[in-house]
UniProtKB/Swiss-Prot annotation:
Name listed for the protein in its UniProt record: Vigilin
Domain (KH): residue spans on this chain: 158-229, 230-302, 303-371, 372-442, 443-514, 515-588, 589-660, 661-734, 735-807, 808-880, 881-979, 980-1059, 1060-1134, 1135-1209
Domain of life: Eukaryota
Outcome (variant: residue 568 to N): In a breast cancer sample; somatic mutation
UniProtKB keywords: Acetylation, Cholesterol metabolism, Cytoplasm, HDL, Lipid metabolism, Lipid transport, Nucleus, Phosphoprotein, Repeat, RNA-binding, Steroid metabolism, Sterol metabolism, Transport
Region named Disordered: 914-944, 1233-1268
Modified residues (N6-acetyllysine): 991
UniProt function note: Appears to play a role in cell sterol metabolism. It may function to protect cells from over-accumulation of cholesterol.
Chain intervals with Polar residues compositional bias: 1234-1249
Organism: Homo sapiens
């Protein structure tokens, strides 16, 4: 099919250099000189009158018919045959079995082709493949590779032909492999081999080999030749618009590559078949030799700026000179400073060419007009209207304004440029006479104050003095402000701006000292709090120091009064922060932490809220007992008193106040609290609280069990007395492993030293860095005596001795079981003494001890005690029903572990039996035995305890009996509590959380009856000591639930209010803000009707809560409705180009306007029919004020938008092209649409103009079309 393109003159000129001579006619540059346009019939030849395709179906007639291709079927079928000798899988009894079937299935799934297999009489395999062409070819390749035995062969072709076998991106090779169903391996480029390996069937190999050799043979016919030709003669060989070289290429079929003028290469490359290539080379050589003899050169000087006019757009002018005169014009490169242009050609034609070169050079000129850069936008005019007058008269002149330069550049035909220059110079002169500008320096930090809130100050100055004020953006940090306009207005604006700046320079700067730790809190998360302060004091600049500087100075700058107000505000804020950051630590016994937290955190939450403090408790798995309270000092003290009172109520905790002079407190506490900690640990972990340093109080509070408090009081007073009389301290060192031995069992040894000398000995705590240091405090003589005793003990410990003792082998196992637990305990207690028992299996009774002499003796004594216990060991049975065993053991066996430690006994529980109930069935005789034979009598006695109930206790008799009593005391007891059935589910709580919490808190088991029983009785099982507390807790919970039920009944009061659905969104508010506030304020639930529910009244809003609260909420909603009914909505046309600026970043600006005027402003969505329509809703007077305000903003912003758009047009770089008259496009004559109206309209009744259809013609067989 032919195609018709509509070309403008510009695009025609751009493309003609690439067309062959037969396709174009020579055209001149000016459209006026063009030949007559072609007729419509020439441009669009009519189709043949009679379609020959019906008469001659096999040979369609006409140029259009030649292009028709038969439609190919989308699904094809191919059949492949695999001979018996080439089959991979021959040994098959039946088709469809084994590996062959699997392979076919895989091929079908992967390729999407359909396979059908059949066996011929000669046992050859026929495969029919159906599907799309690609799928069939891929399936065929897979079938050959996997069902047919593979052979291989090699073919050698020249290495340089390999790339033609591969083809572009390997496409040729892939295609070849698919066609021949083979695998072709070509050596890598770095491999010198020229052998190509082909793998596949014999038939496929032959085909592939043939194709490869054909490709190689085809390449053998072709040749490449390079011809060196001087660069200067390339234009003659190429010819004007590359026509000459195009002709040679077309006639010889040879490809000729001439390097472009920009590439500094001289060789011309020829590619083609050898004979034609030789002809092409001969013709080029002939042209080169001829031109070399006949041509000569002349050099002329042409201004560098005019070179581009000689070259012309895309080199067209050079081609035009070459075409007209046969002379080549050589222009120096653009980066060269040379202005010499060389003309090369036959002598008689050089004159004409030189004339044309000068004509082209002088056809355009460049001129400049001096104009201050600040006047440029006034010269351009509003929306570019001033310049439009000049450019409309002289469209070929290009006017360029360069930002920052005091000149305007004009470029175009000389006459037009001169006229335009005169006009622009007149405009500049007029503007200079009428206008003035001034530049003033004002510190950039004052610029935003000069601009004012939303540009209020600067806009007032602009309107008042009719001037333009240019303030640089903050990012430039420039101090220069430029004022342009009427000379008088400029001076007045300058005076006012300088006065404002002067006033600001006289502003006060104040340094505020705020501890750096509070800076982050004052700034707030993402700067929220500091933003609030800045909004409160907008005229004050607040600068915080860089965190890396570690500075406490915060700088405030602004008007004196505002700075003072801001200072007071921030000082008050800091005072509140300091006051609220007071912190105290309260030591509370760990077992009472859960009581202080209370049920669901109720107690701790109540204390926090009422005291307005932050209370941090240690983690449950932490060993710390300290609770930290943070807040105001008075509040912290109140919270501490409440927490301590809870502890006091819960246990037998005594509290004693001791008066000790404040000056002794630090010495009593000791370094890092070591001294006071040693007293607290020694006296059963009592809590000793000293008053805050600097308070002047002498009162020290001791809190804990009564006996321990008295003991601690005595020690504290004794220590204080010592400190007051004379305090002396000595440090001695001993290995950490000796410390336990020096302290002795239960602190016996160290107590003996203290009692005998009167000195206090302090050992390091586990967290202390120096673990060797032991401190002795007291009177000098007592300290010296204690030091002497301890050093003697340490010296003895340093003297290592080895001793042995005899231990009956039957007892050895007791010492080494559980990975030598008993031996480890002995080593820890007796200064790291090493005890070695003989290896198991040997009958030796000798045990070796190695360590300090005293330690060895003490260890021997301890081993002897253990042996005596073992020999005096008895076994007692304690019968406790198996169902109570888990309760007796306690969490993770903690209760049993405590009993074994307290009474030094071993306790063994029986194995658990699945059937824990007594069997009522008679005992079955086994092997004819009587019921009692071979069994203990007690097993058969129904009254005796079961084996699974018996707990074995081993140890000394008296200790076993005491342990038995302790175990029996752990057997849980059950009591019943009456709780109304309807409260049971609330007692259980969500997913059992309530009942589980109560069980954990009181360490009991609570059994709630099944719902179907409708019983009011709840059973509590646990230790007798815990039952009373659990019962009281349960009854307390019942009281709470009953109170909640009553409260729920009161809260369920419902009230309906009728409100028009159109007001619902306003009542709900943005993101539900309004309705949420009403809900929270009145503590009610407000339900709006469901829009999708047609049965529900859409104007009913339901309020649920206390009766008084629902009525208050109803009144609040009706107030909003009343306000909304008074509101009006008005549409205002607002240019869409300024919408974004009015809305502001993230809607900040529009929100400010809406808040200021108390209106709602809605902008059109993208794609709206009227993009300029903005809706304002609110009270009538507010709507009017808001509309006036946004229309003022529109006028101000629109001026900037228009100026910016106009400037953009003239700030673009010039297109260095010849100016042309407006294009006429593609023109034809005698087109149907140009027929004169006088022509007669077609006669619809005429049979000639509208012939009737003849009789139906019998259809003829066509080469393609629908199936018959």
């Amino acid at each position: 099919m032919s195609s018709v393109a509509v070309l403008t003159q510009e695009s025609f000129a751009e493309h003609r250099s690439g067309l062959v001579p037969q396709q174009i006619k020579v055209a001149t540059l000016n459209s006026e000189e063009e030949s007559d346009p072609p007729t419509y019939k020439d441009a669009f030849p009519p189709l043949p009158e009679k379609a020959a395709c019906l008469e001659s179906a096999q040979e369609p007639a006409g140029a259009w018919g030649n292009k028709i291709r038969p439609i190919k079927a989308s699904v094809i079928t191919q059949v492949f045959h695999v001979p018996l000798e080439e089959r991979k899988y021959k040994d098959m009894n039946q088709f469809g079995e084994g590996e062959q079937a699997k392979i076919c299935l895989e091929i079908m799934q992967r390729t999407g082709a359909h396979l059908e297999l059949s066996l011929a009489k000669d046992q050859g395999l026929s495969i029919m493949v159906s599907g799309k062409l690609d799928a069939v070819m891929k399936a065929r390749k897979d079938i050959v590779a996997r069902l047919q035995t593979q052979a291989s062969a090699t073919v050698a072709i020249p290495k340089e032909h390999h790339r033609f076998v591969i083809g572009k991106n390997g496409e040729k090779l892939q295609d070849l492999e698919l066609k021949t169903a083979t695998k072709i391996q070509i050596p890598r480029p770095d491999d010198p081999s020229n052998q190509i390996k082909i793998t596949g069937t014999k038939e496929g190999i032959e085909k592939a080999r043939h194709e490869v050799l054909l490709i190689s043979a085809e390449q053998d016919k072709r040749a490449v030749e390079r011809l060196e030709v001087e660069k200067a003669f390339h234009p003659f060989i190429a010819g004007p618009y590359n026509r000459l070289v195009g002709e040679i290429m077309q006639e010889t079929g040879t490809r000729i590559n001439i390097p472009p003028p920009s590439v500094n290469r001289t060789e011309i490359v020829f590619t083609g078949e050898k004979e034609q290539l030789a002809q092409a080379v001969a013709r080029i050589k002939k042209i080169y030799e001829e031109k070399k003899k006949k041509t000569t050169t002349i050099a002329v000087e042409v201004k560098k700026s005019q070179h581009k006019y000689v070259i012309g757009p895309k080199g067209n002018s050079l081609q035009e000179i070459l075409e007209r005169t046969g002379v080549s014009v050589e222009i120096p490169p653009s980066d060269s400073i040379s202005e010499t242009v060389i003309l090369r050609g036959e002598p008689e034609k050089l004159g004409q060419a030189l004339t044309e070169v000068y004509a082209k050079a002088n056809s355009f000129t460049v001129s400049s007009v001096a104009a201050p850069s600040w006047l440029h936008r006034f010269i351009i005019g509003k929306k570019g209207q001033n310049l439009a007058k000049i450019t409309q008269q002289m469209p070929k002149v290009h006017i360029e304004f360069t930002e920052g330069e005091d000149k305007i550049t004009l470029e175009g035909p000389t006459e037009d440029v001169n006229v335009a220059q005169e006009q622009i110079e007149g405009m500049v002169k007029d503007l200079i006479n009428r206008m003035d500008y001034v530049e003033i320096n004002i510190d950039h930090k004052f610029h935003r104050h000069l601009i004012g809130k939303s540009g209020a100050n600067i806009n007032r100055i602009k309107d008042q003095y009719k001037v333009s004020v240019r303030i640089p953006p903050d990012s430039e940090k420039s101090n220069l402000i430029r004022i342009e306009g009427d000379p008088q207005g400029v001076q007045q604006a300058k005076r006012e701006l300088l006065e404002l700046a002067s006033r600001m320079e006289n502003e006060r700067t104040k340094d505020l000292i705020i501890e750096q730790r509070f800076h982050r809190t004052i700034i707030g998360q993402k700067g929220e709090r500091i933003r609030e302060i800045r909004d409160k004091f907008p005229e004050v600049i607040i600068n915080f120091p860089d965190p890396a500087q570690k500075s406490d100075i915060v700088q405030l700058r602004g008007p004196k009064n505002e700075v003072e107000k801001c200072t007071k505000y921030m000082q008050k804020m800091v005072a509140d922060l300091v006051e609220n950051s007071y912190s105290i630590s309260v030591p509370i016994f760990k077992q009472f932490h859960k009581n202080i937290i209370g049920k669901g955190g109720a107690n701790i939450k109540k204390i926090r809220e009422e005291s307005n403090t932050k209370i941090d408790l240690p983690a449950e798995n932490s060993n710390s007992e300290t609770i930290i309270i943070t807040g105001k000092r008075a509040n912290c003290e109140a919270a501490r008193s409440r927490i301590l009172s809870i502890q006091k109520d819960l246990a037998n905790i005594a509290e004693v106040e001791v008066s000790i002079p404040a000056k002794l407190h630090n010495s009593l506490i000791g370094t890092k609290g070591r001294l006071i900690r040693s007293i607290m640990e020694e006296c059963g972990g009592v809590h000793i609280h000293f008053p805050v340093e600097g308070s002047g109080s002498d009162t020290v509070v001791i809190r804990g069990p009564s006996s321990d408090v008295e003991k601690a009081k005595k020690q504290l007073l004794h220590l204080a007395e010592e400190k007051q009389t004379k305090s002396f301290t000595v440090d001695i060192r001993a290995k950490p492993e000796y410390h336990k031995f020096l302290i002795g069992k239960g602190g016996g040894k160290i107590r003996k030293v203290r009692d005998s000398t009167g000195a206090r000995v302090i050992f390091p705590a586990a967290e202390d860095k120096d673990q060797d240091l032991i401190t002795i405090i007291g009177k000098e003589d007592a300290v010296r005596e204690a030091q002497k005793e301890l050093e003697a003990l340490i010296q003895n410990l340093d003297n290592v001795v080895e001793d042995s003792m005899l231990v009956d082998p039957k007892h050895h196992r007791h010492f080494v079981i559980r990975r030598g637990q008993v031996l480890r305990e002995i080593a820890e207690e007796y200064g790291g003494v090493m005890v070695s028992f003989p290896r198991s299996g040997t009958q030796s009774d000798k045990v070796t001890l190695k360590g300090a002499k005293d330690c060895v003796e003490a260890a021997k004594k301890r081993i002897q005690e253990i042996i005596e216990d073992l020999e005096a060991q008895v076994t007692l049975e304690c019968a406790i029903p198996q169902k109570f065993h888990r309760s007796v053991m306690g969490p993770k066996g903690s209760r049993i572990q405590q009993i074994t430690r307290d009474f030094s006994v071993q306790i063994k529980f029986p194995d658990r039996e699945e059937n824990a109930v007594h069997s009522t069935e008679p005992v079955v005789q086994e092997n004819g035995d009587e019921a009692g034979e071979g069994r203990e009598a007690k097993d058969c006695d129904p009254g005796s305890p079961r084996r699974c109930d018996i707990i074995i206790i081993s140890g000394r008799k008296e200790k076993c009996e005491a342990a038995k009593e302790a175990l029996e005391a752990l057997v849980p007891v059950t009591i019943e509590v009456e709780v109304p059935f309807d409260l049971h589910r609330y007692v259980i709580g969500q997913k059992g959380s309530g009942i589980r919490k109560m069980m954990d808190e009181f360490e009991v088991n609570i059994h709630v009856p099944a719902p179907e029983l409708q019983s009011d009785i709840i059973a509590i099982t646990g230790l007798a000591a815990n039952l009373d507390r659990a019962k009281a807790g349960l009854l307390e919970r019942v009281k709470e639930l009953q109170a909640e039920q009553e409260d729920r009944a009161l809260r369920s009061f419902k009230l309906s209010v009728t409100v028009d659905p159109k007001y619902h969104p306003k009542i709900i508010g943005r993101k539900g803000a309004v309705i949420t506030q009403i809900r929270l304020e009145h503590d009610v639930n407000i339900q709006f009707p469901d829009k999708d529910d047609g049965n529900q009244p859409q104007d009913q809003i339901t309020i649920t809560g206390y009766e008084k609260n629902t009525e208050a909420a109803r009144d609040a909603i009706l107030r909003i409705v009343g306000e909304l009914e008074q509101m009006v909505s008005e549409d205002v046309p607002l240019d869409h180009r300024v919408h974004a600026r009015i809305i502001g970043a993230r809607g900040k600006a529009i929100r400010k306007i809406m808040d200021e005027f108390k209106v709602d402003i809605r902008f059109p969505q993208s794609g709206a029919p009227d993009p300029n329509c903005v809706t304002v809703t609110g009270l009538p007077e507010n709507v009017e004020e808001a509309i006036d305000h946004i229309l003022n903003l529109e006028e101000e912003y629109l001026a900037d938008v228009v100026d910016s758009e106009a400037l953009q047009v003239y700030m673009k770089p010039p297109a260095h092209e010849e100016a042309k008259a407006p294009s006429r496009g593609f023109v034809v004559r005698d087109a149907p649409w140009t027929a004169s109206s006088s022509e007669k309209a077609p006669d619809m009744s005429s049979s000639e103009e509208f012939p009737s259809f003849g009789a139906q013609v019998a259809p003829k067989t066509l080469p393609w079309g629908p199936k018959r």
